[in-house]
A protein has these predicted regions:
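Short, membrane-interfacial amphipathic segments enriched in basic
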Residues: 1-6
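Membrane-interface junctions
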Residues: 14-18, 53, 158, 171
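Hydrophobic, regular-secondary-structure patches
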Residues: 18-103, 124, 128, 139-150
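A short, structural micro-pattern
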Residues: 53-55, 98-99, 112, 159, ...
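Residue-level signal for secondary-structure boundary sites
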Residues: 69, 112, 173-174
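Hydrophobic secondary-structure segments that place a key small or acidic residue at a functional site
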Residues: 87, 103-107, 119-194
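Cytochrome P450 core scaffold surrounding the K-helix E-X-X-R motif
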Residues: 111-118
Length: 194
């Protein structure tokens, strides 16, 4: 060994604690960088998978009123593969003695949504042709431990209506429950989606 290498080995042996601390700090830095990076990549893959499975919207537009034929006319435009209309309203609800605001989102009378499809978590999809049933989004279901068959009462413009819960669903629009762009986090005990 050359004199310089011998001196290096002597210095490493003398300052072993400092060398160990430097190695530990570098290793922790690498772990702290790669851990979140890998978690973000996995989360992005999961979200993209759900978006693909549910045919998540590329674009949406809100309006107060539109003719029933509007979605069909939009679907006939070039480069538009699917367009679907639905009604979205907010109302007050009671579930297991708790009052909260719910966002009521309609689904097609026949079949399942072609855009923003739903993944059944518990229970089943709405029974065809049967009224009086609703599905609840999984944040609401988890918050109140809702199971199929339990009642949910909605108070709207036309009065009070009680529905039987048919199932709990995951919606691509509400992977993270947010009521509006002004809120960063929404309390599922105060707001839900049905």
């Amino acid at each position: 060994l050359s004199r310089l290498n011998k001196k290096l080995l002597r210095d490493l042996a003398t300052h072993w604690a400092q060398v160990g601390a430097i190695v530990a700090v570098v290793a922790l830095g690498i772990i702290m960088f790669t851990g979140p990076l890998l978690a973000t990549r996995d989360l992005k893959d999961s979200v993209n998978d759900i978006y693909k499975r549910t045919h998540y919207e590329d674009f949406s537009a809100s309006m107060d009123q539109a003719p029933a034929t509007a979605a069909g006319r939009l679907a006939s435009l070039p480069n538009v593969t699917t367009a679907e209309g639905r009604i979205i309203r907010e109302a007050q609800a009671r579930v297991l003695g708790h009052r909260l605001t719910v966002r009521v989102i309609t689904v097609p009378d026949k079949g399942r949504p072609a855009v923003n499809g739903l993944i059944i978590e518990k229970g089943s999809y709405l029974p065809p042709g049967a009224g009086g049933f609703t599905m609840v989004e999984h944040h609401l279901s988890s918050e109140f431990n809702l199971k199929p068959g339990l009642p949910l009462t909605v108070v709207g413009d036309s009065g009070e209506m009680t529905f039987s819960i048919s199932g709990s669903v995951v919606s691509p629009e509400y992977l993270r429950l947010v009521r509006s762009r002004a809120e960063y986090v929404t309390d599922p005990a105060q707001f839900g989606v049905i």
